[in-house]
Amino acid sequence: LVSATRGDGTTLQEALVAEGLAAVDSHGDNTAHTARLLELEEQARNAGLGAWGLRDLVVHSADPNALAPFLDSVQIIEGRVISTGAARDGRIYLNFGTDWRTDFTVQVMRRNQRRFEAAGIDLRALGGAIIRVRGWVAEENGPMITLDHPEALELVDAPEPARLPGR
């Protein structure tokens, strides 16, 4: 990864995101500047700048039928978590519909859950919350994103218990 800085101290990544020419795609091993980039992305999106204004960049709804053309690509998806669940192997699922076999789902593997806890996000308490997630959309009993770091999940509107006490 190359980090280029302009004369005013703004990084190239910040400039591209702020002008709506790029969306944030954070990775678990590279999250130091994600919060700032997400702020800039939201400002560009709300102002309809660059690709946001052209609708080349969009925040998709969690509708599985609408997501079908976007399988096998990185996308941003927003919706209400209808329920949460856990598998025997410790995976946590965030379900965006009543049928996990076809609806959009987010999964977090057991090995990554401590990162969410450390960030103050109680995944099991997200039922009813509206969240925005970003990542690779795969087909696994409907469209699914596997999150490995909390910076890829934004709480848009969360019920009070969605955050761990004291955070």
Predicted regions and their residues:
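Small beta-barrel nucleic-acid-binding modules, primarily SNase/OB-fold domains
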Residues: 1-167
